[in-house]
Amino acid sequence: MVLSYSDTRRLLELVGKDAIMRETVSRLRQGLAEVAGGKRQKCPPRSGFVIGDDAGEGVIVNMPYRQDREGMTLKTISYKPLNNSTNWLPTVVGALNRYSDETGELAAICDATIPTAIRTGATTAIASSLLARPGAHAVALVGAGLQSVTQLHGLSIAFDMDVVRVYDINAVRAQSLRERCAFTHARFEVADNPQTAVDGADILVTATSVRPGAGPVVRDEHLAEHLHINSIGSDEPGKTELPRSILERAFVCVDHIEQALAEGECQVLDPHQIDAVLEDLVFDAACHERQLPQTEQLTVFDSTGFAF
């Protein structure tokens, strides 16, 4: 079976974006709880290569996951920050390859661009539902590319958003976000700078293509005491979106400790400064059905992405 980018777009239309996002959130939440409960294995850290001689040209990484007696799925994903401007392609592209456990044969190939964006948005929805203040309604976005759409889509399922403030270095891209997000009736405001977008926000998503060494993209100034931050843009050594001071005073949750320390926001921290792993919070919430006390303090979710 071969599913192209066009095929995945068509599936979204046939099944419905809301239905797919809700199902992804539900299955991911269940799966994370199963990892924490010992019913599923945690995937190994991803491996890959930095592209080119200069920092910021991109990376290509491999993310494997095997289900016993079923098969192995290998996602190869490439991050090329200039892809959109030079090749009219998304900055994140890749492929999902499914191998049979019985025969070892390649059984299916699927373009990974849309599934990756949906999965990342679903993870943000889960992390935010646990760490953001209940009733959060003001969302800030720094970065308005493809990922920003599914980030907002996931959040729209978990929260009743009424205002979205967006900043992007490309003003046209920021202006176009409203029409790309027909799933929400929230009011959209385009900010002149990142700090204006963040001012008064309950939830912040940073989804940028900042070059290694060029961050952070926001300052540690005038942040709401209860602000929850989802940082999804850090994916290689030297590339960070947040000031270290935010991480050092926040409750920090990661999706994969080894990856976060190697290439996520937490690459500037020591292991003991990481407070939680997402699957443990999901498992705890499922077992005890209680609100976490961290929802009233500054929290950060360091999202690096992992096979599942």
Regions found by a protein language model. Give the residues of each.
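Short helix-loop-beta connector
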Residues: 131-138, 160, 224-225
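Glycine-rich Rossmann-fold phosphate-binding loop(s) that bind the pyrophosphate
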Residues: 143-145
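Short glycine-/small-residue-rich Rossmann-like dinucleotide-binding loops
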Residues: 208-210, 233-234
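Rossmann-fold NAD(P) dinucleotide-binding segment
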Residues: 212-227
